[in-house]
Amino acid sequence: LYMLMPDRFANGNPKNDVLKTMRDKNCDRHAPSLRHGGDLEGIRQHLDYFNQLGVTALWFTPVLEIDSPGDGKSSSYHGYATTNYYKVDPRFGTNAEYKRLIDEAHQKGLKIVMDMIFNHCGFEHPWIADMPSKDWFNCPEWLLPEYQTPEHVKKIGTVDGARTVNDMYRQTSYKLTPVLDPYASKVDMEETVDGWFVPSM
């Protein structure tokens, strides 16, 4: 099993790197926190490479659409902030290109594992925009969009120093993803753990 992050693997179609139809217009291979342009076509072009490695299955980080605004500093290149669970992110390709990749992978004896994340989504997803109640999600209040105001940040401090772990995480029966998330931000990792291990891998 070979796990890969499509945005970081290979750019097979530079024309889909920045699209007018998407809110985030940032793509810069020199910026670690921005999109780099890898896509499904880049993976398809390298299927023989995986055969040469002896790989029998590919596990991608999510490739579903993330139409979130970009700030030029960071992006959800990793795929874990879905805004549309029915469509491949056009910066990765199309649903048809995804099907073509799967078909060609199967012809070469490769299986495809799709990473599906239904325990959270992007802030621009309709589930967040139209919540039936304020506590619909198990989410620290400071992460909710209505709390991302200068007044609120002044009140509680910033992530990069003034805020403490107790301000960021509350006691709950749910497992909060930043604690055990291998794709967590540097700030989250510094506030929680130094590594990540899953015995089933």
Feature names for model-found ranges:
Residues 1-10:
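Mature N-terminal segment immediately following signal peptide/propeptide cleavage
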Residues 9-56, 62-201:
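Substrate-binding/active-site clefts of carbohydrate-active enzymes
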